[in-house]
């Protein structure tokens, strides 16, 4: 059977379409590329809710979040919990922020309209099956702290997968996996008894994005940058921003061979 993500249920799609305007803050974001909302299950069946900060270039191509190098690290994290399907990933912001302006964008999270829309989304996509929440990075942590109706489940607050503090990243992720394994029920096709993280990230700690998380018609290699990570020079993503036109041009390279 061909696996692909058919898109959000009608009620969730209607809510996503009502995302509050970012136009007043467009100088803080890659605004003209538009919003990107989710990856995974939106039918309230998720056992784990993952919240990151914002989407990146690869996510724009995929129209799904956490698909590039950072997303493949998160997928490896999910794999260590034995989750192959029962998860949902969203972001604190619907738009990608400019890295140099990330702290300036923090107050937007607390704007009443943004906070209300985000909290309603989170409450719409989780249900009684939820067993845990993971926040990846500062913005995600703030988003959960502002979620007044957050379910009473285990919440692990860890660094973003792109954190430059490699030691804290691997240490905190290792501890989170240990704790979450005590409460997250693995999927039937998953295994939570494999190795945890070691002293540093290795290729075995990554996992490709499942085809069932992506729209129909995506290339087979989108969401799996293992060849690029092992190439010289190393390419962690097939999609990157063009240095000559950072705001409006993406470069998408198909792997060779």
Annotate each language-model stretch with its function.
Residues 1-180, 186-257:
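A polyanion-binding, active-site-adjacent surface
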């Amino acid at each position: 059977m061909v696996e692909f993500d058919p898109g959000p249920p009608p009620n969730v799609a209607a809510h996503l379409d009502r995302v509050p305007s970012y136009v007043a803050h467009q100088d803080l974001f890659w605004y003209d590329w538009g919003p990107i909302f989710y990856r995974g299950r939106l039918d309230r069946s998720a056992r784990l809710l993952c919240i990151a900060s914002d989407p990146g270039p690869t996510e724009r191509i995929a129209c799904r979040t956490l698909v590039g190098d950072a997303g493949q690290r998160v997928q490896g994290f999910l794999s260590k919990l034995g989750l192959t399907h029962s998860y949902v990933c969203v972001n604190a912001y619907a738009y990608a922020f400019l890295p140099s302006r990330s702290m300036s964008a923090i107050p937007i999270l607390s704007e009443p309209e943004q906070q209300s829309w985000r909290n309603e989304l989170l409450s719409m996509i989780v249900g009684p099956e939820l067993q845990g929440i993971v926040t990846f990075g500062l913005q995600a942590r703030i988003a959960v702290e502002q979620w007044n109706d957050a379910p009473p489940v285990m919440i692990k607050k860890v660094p973003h997968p792109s954190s430059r503090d490699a030691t804290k990243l691997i240490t905190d992720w290792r501890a989170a996996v240990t704790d979450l394994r005590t409460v997250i029920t693995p999927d039937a096709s998953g295994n939570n008894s494999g190795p945890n993280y070691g002293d540093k990230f290795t290729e075995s700690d990554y996992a490709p994005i499942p085809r069932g998380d992506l729209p129909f018609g995506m290339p087979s290699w989108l969401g799996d940058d293992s060849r690029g990570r092992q190439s010289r020079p190393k390419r962690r993503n097939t999609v990157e921003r063009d240095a000559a036109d950072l705001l409006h041009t993406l470069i998408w390279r198909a792997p060779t061979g």
